[in-house]
Amino acid sequence: MKVRPSVKKMCEKCKIIKRKGRVMVICENPKHKQKQG
């Protein structure tokens, strides 16, 4: 899980979602998981 000021899709399979008011990226590739914060 990467924590970044700005989250971006890193590949085609990345999905941007909002959880508890936080923007997150979920993906099949665990390296692509990101959280804004």
Curated annotation (Swiss-Prot):
Pfam families per the UniProt record, alphabetical: Ribosomal_L36 (PF00444)
Domain of life: Bacteria
One Gene Ontology molecular-function label: structural constituent of ribosome
UniProtKB keywords: Ribonucleoprotein, Ribosomal protein
GO cellular component: cytoplasm; ribonucleoprotein complex; ribosome
GO biological process, one term: translation
InterPro entries: Ribosomal_bL36, Ribosomal_bL36_sp
PANTHER family: 50S RIBOSOMAL PROTEIN L36, CHLOROPLASTIC, LARGE RIBOSOMAL SUBUNIT PROTEIN BL36C
Family, similarity comment: Belongs to the bacterial ribosomal protein bL36 family.
Protein name: Large ribosomal subunit protein bL36
Record organism: Caldanaerobacter subterraneus subsp. tengcongensis (strain DSM 15242 / JCM 11007 / NBRC 100824 / MB4)
Lineage, highest ranks first: Bacteria, Bacillati, Bacillota, Clostridia, Thermoanaerobacterales
